[in-house]
Regions:
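Short amphipathic alpha-helical segments with coiled-coil-like heptad repeat character
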Residues: 1-2, 237
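A composition/secondary-structure signal for short, hydrophobic, low-basic-content segments
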Residues: 2, 22-24
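Bacterial N-terminal signal peptides that target proteins for export
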Residues: 2-11
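Bacterial N-terminal signal peptides
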Residues: 10-22
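Eukaryotic scaffold repeat domains enriched in small/polar residues
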Residues: 27-353
C-alpha cells in the first residue's frame, strides 16, 4: 500500500526552499541534534560504511591509517605514497582497533569496496563495484566465497545464506544471490526519470537496508520526491511505499526535476541528492532519513516522530552518508568529517543555520 506522508514540519519547508535559493535564505530556528562525541578518531576521508557485528565489534569500511612516514633524504627524489585502499577495520566496543579484513589482500580480491554488511553468524559481505564482485569472509578474516556480481553498490545479508545487492547497471532495483553466487531473483521497478538509459540508471541509485524478518527497504537517493519502498525479500513483492509529496516539499522536487531536464538539452547534469542516508532499526522497524542535514525519524507505521538539524561536536553542519541505528544511540557518518554518536531522541537546542 502506498502511503503519502502529510508533513507540515517547518524544517522541511526550510530545506525545500533552501535547495532552490540557498544563498538568499537562512533556515529558521529548527530543532537541533548535536553529536555527543566522535568515535574511531582517524576515520574520515574515504569512509564508506559502518556495521555492528553479533559479537559487539564495529566493522568500518574505510582506508586504514597510513604507515609512519620514512625520513626523506632528498626532496627531489621523494615520492608521495598513494593513499591506502579501503579495508574493513574492526574495532571493539571501546574503539580499540583489533584487526583488518582482508588481513592479506590477494591480487584482484578487493579493488575498491563500496559497501559491506554482516550476517547473524558474523560473516562479512563486501561489495566491490570496481571489481564487479562480492567477497564473503569469516569474522576472523578467512575468505569463504568470491564471485562476480555486476557493479554492486549496496549489499545486505539475508537469512538462509542469501544476500541482496543493488547494481549500478541493473534493470531492477534489487537482486538476491546465494553463497554460491547464483542469482535467485530480481525485483523492484525503476522510476522513469530520464530518456537517457545511462542517466536513468544513475538516478535510480539508492540505499538498501533490512529488518530482522528479512524485509528489504530501498530509499531512492535522487528521486525528487523522497521515497522509501519496503519489499518482501523472499517473493520480491512490494509491501509498502512511503513518498513525501506535500506542498512543503514541492520546491525541492521541482528543482531536482529541472536539473534532470537539463540532460535533454545536452548540458552536464549534476543530480540533486535528496536522501543522503537511510538507517533502519531491525528490531522495531523504525527508520531515519537524512535530507541534507535534516534528520527525520519515522516509527514503524511511517509516522514522523521527530525532525532535527544535525551538527558535529564542533557545531559543524553534518550531511551524513551513513546511519547506523543502535539500541541507545545513532552513529552518523560523513566523508570526510568522520563518525559521530548521536542520541536517538531529539534535543531541545535551537540554532540558526
Amino acid at each position: 500500500m502506498k502511503r503519502i506522508a502529510q508533513i507540515r514540519v517547518l524544517a522541511l519547508a526550510t530545506l525545500s526552499a533552501g535547495i532552490v535559493c540557498a544563498p538568499l535564505l537562512q533556515a529558521q530556528e529548527d530543532p537541533t541534534l548535536d553529536a555527543t562525541r566522535r568515535v574511531f578518531g582517524y576515520i574520515g576521508p574515504g569512509f564508506r560504511a559502518v556495521r555492528r557485528g553479533p559479537d559487539g565489534s564495529y566493522y568500518v569500511l574505510a582506508p586504514p591509517p597510513p604507515p609512519p612516514a620514512a625520513p626523506v633524504k632528498s626532496f627531489t627524489a621523494s615520492k608521495v605514497p598513494p593513499p591506502p585502499s579501503p579495508a574493513v577495520l574492526i574495532f571493539d566496543s571501546r574503539g580499540k582497533e583489533l584487526r583488518h579484513i582482508p588481513a592479506q589482500t590477494r591480487p584482484g580480491e578487493v579493488v575498491s569496496p563500496s559497501a559491506l554488511d554482516l550476517d547473524t553468524s558474523g560473516r562479512v559481505y563486501i561489495a566491490d563495484q570496481s571489481a564487479n564482485s562480492v567477497s564473503v569472509y569469516t569474522a576472523s578474516g578467512t575468505l569463504v566465497a568470491h564471485f562476480l556480481v555486476p557493479e554492486p553498490t549496496q549489499i545486505v545479508a539475508l537469512p538462509h545464506d542469501q544476500f541482496a545487492v543493488c547494481s549500478a547497471n541493473a534493470d531492477r532495483l534489487i537482486a538476491v544471490y546465494d553463497l554460491q553466487g547464483k542469482l535467485l531473483r530480481e525485483f523492484g521497478e525503476m522510476e522513469d526519470l530520464s530518456d537517457d538509459p545511462e542517466l536513468n540508471h544513475r538516478l535510480n541509485a539508492g540505499h538498501l537496508a533490512a529488518d530482522k524478518a528479512g524485509n528489504l527497504y530501498f530509499a531512492f537517493r535522487y528521486l525528487p520526491e523522497p521515497t522509501v519502498r519496503k519489499y518482501d525479500s523472499a517473493s520480491g513483492l512490494l509491501l509498502d511505499e512511503l513518498s513525501l509529496t506535500t506542498l512543503d516539499l514541492q520546491p525541492m522536487a521541482q528543482s531536482a526535476r529541472q536539473e534532470i531536464a537539463r540532460a535533454d538539452s545536452g548540458k552536464p547534469v549534476n543530480p540533486h541528492e535528496i536522501i543522503s542516508a537511510f538507517g533502519m532499526d531491525p528490531e522495531t522497524q523504525e527508520f531515519w532519513l537524512a535530507l541534507g542535514n535534516l534528520l527525520i525519524h519515522f516509527d514503524n507505521a511511517d509516522n514522523i516522530t521527530a525532525s532535527n538539524r544535525i551538527y558535529t561536536t564542533y557545531a559543524i553542519r553534518m550531511v551524513p552518508n551513513s546511519i547506523l541505528v543502535e539500541k541507545d544511540h545513532l552513529l552518523l557518518s560523513n566523508d570526510p568529517l568522520g563518525i559521530y554518536e548521536f542520541a536517538r531522541s531529539s534535543a531541545s537546542v535551537h540554532r540558526s543555520e
